[in-house]
Regions:
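Short, charged/polar surface micro-motifs in flexible loops or helix N-caps
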Residues: 54-56, 64-70, 79
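A short, structured loop/turn motif at beta-sheet edges
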Residues: 13, 63-68, 87-96
Length: 145
């Protein structure tokens, strides 16, 4: 089960990457995140914790990181893993941003549907919030120039 949401944001990809890299401030643009932190650099293998606005915090680990392009974090509890992939690519007038979410593990069949429902409801709001956050803090690119 994969969930994906896309949006165009009128800022360069490096602006989005800079926002993503500031993990302690994820809650400023992601209404479904109460707190996030890493115990080290924003790099593959670094562990941390993410606490959703509703629910308990879970450990997370950075599984993929390509500066200026993408990152994937994995939240986990025993026998259930939540994968959150984020990509940004250059586009006319700014950037195309995609967030993908999927679940693995022996208990994915049990926890996946409930978590998927929350993600499907929240992800469009999160993407709109990221767009507003990025464009309010950085001058949007004018595609007419």
């Amino acid at each position: 089960m994969h969930i994906e949401e896309r949006i165009h944001i009128a800022v360069p990809p490096m602006v989005i990457d800079h926002i993503w890299s500031d993990i302690d401030r994820w809650h400023l643009w992601d209404p479904d995140t109460k707190q996030a932190r890493l115990n080290g650099p924003f790099a593959v293998g670094t562990r941390g914790r993410i606490t959703p606005s509703k629910g308990m915090g879970v450990p997370m680990v950075v599984r993929e990181r390509t500066e200026g392009r993408s990152f994937t974090v994995e939240g986990y509890i025993p026998l259930f893993r939540m994968h959150f992939e984020h990509t940004v690519s250059p586009a006319v007038g700014g950037s195309d941003v995609a967030h993908r979410v999927w679940f693995t593990g022996a208990l994915a069949f049990l926890f996946g549907p409930g978590v998927a429902k929350q993600v499907r409801e929240g992800l469009p709001r999160t993407m709109r919030s990221l767009k507003a956050y990025a464009e309010q803090r950085h001058e949007p690119l004018n595609s007419d120039a």
